[in-house]
A protein has these predicted regions:
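Extracytoplasmic "Venus flytrap"/periplasmic binding protein-like
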Residues: 84, 88-158, 193-202, 298-301, ...
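Glycine-centered hinge/linker elements that transmit conformational signals in sensory
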Residues: 210-215, 255-284, 330
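Extracytoplasmic/periplasmic solute-binding protein
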Residues: 169-178, 183, 205-258, 299
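Long, aromatic- and glycine/proline-rich binding clefts that accommodate carbohydrate-like moieties
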Residues: 49, 325-328, 376-429, 433
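Conserved C-terminal helix/tail region of periplasmic/extracytoplasmic solute-binding proteins
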Residues: 35, 41, 193, 409-464
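Short, solvent-exposed loop/beta-turn-alpha elements that line the ligand-binding surface or hinge
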Residues: 141-159, 222-232, 250-268, 315-320, ...
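Hinge/lid segment of periplasmic solute-binding proteins
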Residues: 47-58, 127-184, 223-224, 322-329, ...
Length: 464
C-alpha cells in the first residue's frame, strides 16, 4: 500500500507541474494545394446553406481570444499566422493571442477561468485536458460537417488517421489537432555495421543480439570506464513505456479505465528488464545528454522524441562524428509501434457567432500550407498527408525526420481519458521503478506482475 500511495502522490504533483506537451497512412490524396495561402472561405458553384444559423455579417469585428503554451520560434510563428489571418480573412474576425508558456499553466489557468466566465474562446491544450473540461468544450463536429463552413470529405480524409481520431470521444469532437509528435528508437547504423550487422533488427531476438554485441564490444576495448555501456540507453518516459507495451500487444486503456496487468505488458517488462540484467541496457547519469552519449557511441540505441532530433544531429556535429543514424519504431514480434501524442485546438461554448468565428480560425490553421510552416518550425509530425507535398526540400535536409514520418501508419493513440494526465505519471514511475537495481536487482517471475498490479491500483484511484 505504501508503494501505491507514493505512485498517487507523485502523479498528482507531476500532473500539475509537468503537463507535457509528435509511410503516412495510405488514403486518397487531394489535388496538390496551391502555393498561395487561401484565407477566404472555399467557394463552390452551388454552395449549400449553412445549418449553423449565423449571419455572416455578424462575424465582422468578432473578437476571439486564444491562449497557447508556446514561446520562442513557435510563438513567433503562431502570432505571425494570426496577423496574416486578421489581415486577410473575409469575415473581419479578429484573433488575439496570449502565451501561457507551457501546458501546465494552460490547464491551471483555463480550469480557473471556466469557473468565473473569464476563459478564452480557444486554447491549445492536450486532449486529456479537454476531456476534463467536459461540457464547457464546444463539439466541433457540427462545424466540421457544415455544408458552408465545414470541411469536405476529401479534406477530412487527408488527415492522418491516428491524428484525426484522437480528439473524438463518444461521438463528440473535443478538439482539432494542433501538433503531434512521437518517440522513436534511434539506431547507429555505422557502428552496427562495424559490429557485423547489415540491417536494423527485425525481431526481439535480433534486437537483443545487437544491443548485447555493442555491450561486449565496449567490454573488450581499451577503456575500462565504458564497460557497463553499449546497448540500449534506458528511457523511462511514459510514451517510451507505452510504445514498448503496444509492441508486445499490451497497452494502457480498457474501456473507461486502465489495465496495466496484461500478458503483453508483463512480457514487455520482463524482456526489457532481462536486457538490463545482461548489461545490454543501462541507466545513464544525467551529466550528459542523450544525444551526446549516442554520438559518443555509448549506446547503439537511444530513445528520443521527434522534436529532439535536431539536438541529436547537433551532438553528432559537436562530436565530429560521421556515423549514420536512423529512426526506427518500437519493434515487437508481430508489430512495430509508435505512440502519437500532442496538443489540440479546443474551443469553448459561447455565443453562436463567436463559436463560428473560432472554428473558422481553427480551420484556416489546418490548411496544408500552414501545417507545412509548423513542421519546418517545430520538426514534428505532419497532420495531413498532403502537407508532405510541400515538404520535399525539408525531407531531404532532415532524413531522420523523413524516416520517422513513414511510421505514422504504425501509430497508436494515447488513452482517451481525462485522468491520463495523472496516470501517465504512474506509468512512468512504474517503468522507472522496474529498472531500479537496488529495489529490483533481479526481476523474478512474479515481480513484473506485482509492479503492474500496483500501477493498476494507483490508476484506479486516480481515475475515480
Amino acid at each position: 500500500m505504501k508503494f501505491i500511495k507514493i505512485f498517487i502522490t507523485l502523479a498528482l504533483i507531476a500532473g500539475l507541474a509537468n503537463a507535457c506537451a509528435p509511410a503516412i497512412t495510405p488514403v486518397a490524396q487531394t489535388p496538390l494545394p496551391s502555393a498561395t495561402k487561401q484565407v477566404a472561405a472555399t467557394k463552390t458553384p452551388t454552395p449549400a446553406a449553412s445549418r449553423l444559423e449565423v449571419e455572416v455579417e455578424a462575424l465582422r469585428g468578432k473578437q476571439v481570444n486564444v491562449w497557447h503554451p508556446w514561446f520562442g520560434a513557435e510563438a513567433n510563428l503562431f502570432e505571425s499566422q494570426i496577423k496574416e489571418f486578421n489581415a486577410a480573412n473575409e469575415w473581419g474576425i479578429v484573433i488575439n493571442a496570449e502565451s501561457k508558456g507551457n501546458y501546465s499553466e494552460i490547464l491551471l489557468q483555463t480550469s480557473a477561468a471556466l469557473t468565473d466566465s473569464s476563459a478564452p474562446q480557444i486554447v491549445i491544450a492536450l486532449p486529456e485536458h479537454a476531456l476534463a473540461w467536459g461540457d464547457d468544450v464546444l463539439d466541433l463536429n457540427p462545424y466540421m460537417h457544415d455544408p458552408e463552413f465545414g470541411m469536405n470529405a476529401l479534406d477530412m480524409s487527408d488527415f492522418v488517421s491516428v491524428v484525426w481520431r484522437q480528439d473524438e470521444v463518444d461521438g463528440k469532437r473535443f478538439g482539432a489537432p494542433a501538433q503531434r509528435t512521437a518517440r522513436f528508437m534511434l539506431y547507429n547504423r555505422t557502428w552496427a555495421r562495424q559490429l557485423g550487422f547489415d540491417a536494423p533488427p527485425q525481431t526481439l531476438a535480433e534486437f537483443e543480439a545487437q544491443v548485447c554485441a555493442a555491450h561486449v564490444a565496449l567490454m573488450n576495448d581499451s577503456d575500462p570506464n565504458n564497460n557497463s555501456l553499449g546497448g540500449w540507453l534506458i528511457d523511462a518516459n511514459a510514451y517510451t513505456a507505452l510504445s514498448w507495451m503496444f509492441a508486445f500487444g499490451g497497452g494502457a486503456q480498457v474501456e473507461d479505465g486502465y489495465r496495466f496487468l496484461s500478458p503483453g505488458n508483463v512480457a514487455a517488462f520482463k524482456y526489457l528488464k532481462a536486457l538490463q540484467q545482461k548489461s545490454c541496457a543501462w541507466v545513464a547519469a544525467p551529466n550528459l545528454s542523450v544525444g551526446e552519449r549516442f554520438a559518443a557511441r555509448q549506446a547503439l540505441f537511444v530513445t528520443a522524441g521527434l522534436g529532439e532530433f535536431s539536438d541529436v544531429a547537433r551532438a553528432f556535429v559537436a562530436a565530429n562524428s560521421a556515423d549514420e543514424w536512423i529512426a526506427l519504431p518500437f519493434s515487437g514480434e508481430e508489430r512495430d509501434e509508435i505512440v502519437v501524442y500532442g496538443s489540440s485546438f479546443i474551443a469553448f461554448q459561447s455565443d453562436a457567432e463567436t463559436q463560428l468565428a473560432s472554428w473558422l480560425f481553427i480551420r484556416w490553421t489546418l490548411s496544408p500550407e500552414n501545417q507545412a510552416e509548423w513542421v519546418k518550425s517545430a520538426g514534428l509530425l505532419p497532420l495531413r498527408n498532403s502537407t508532405l507535398d510541400l515538404l520535399a526540400e525539408y525531407s531531404t535536409d532532415h532524413p531522420q525526420w523523413a524516416q520517422a514520418v513513414t511510421y505514422l501508419s504504425n501509430g497508436e493513440a494515447t488513452p482517451q481519458l481525462s485522468s491520463w494526465r495523472l496516470v501517465r505519471v504512474v506509468l512512468e514511475d512504474g517503468f522507472r521503478d522496474m529498472f531500479d537495481v537496488i529495489r529490483h536487482p533481479d526481476l523474478t517471475e512474479g515481480q513484473a506482475p506485482v509492479i503492474l498490479t500496483q500501477m493498476d491500483e494507483a490508476a484506479d484511484e486516480l481515475n475515480k
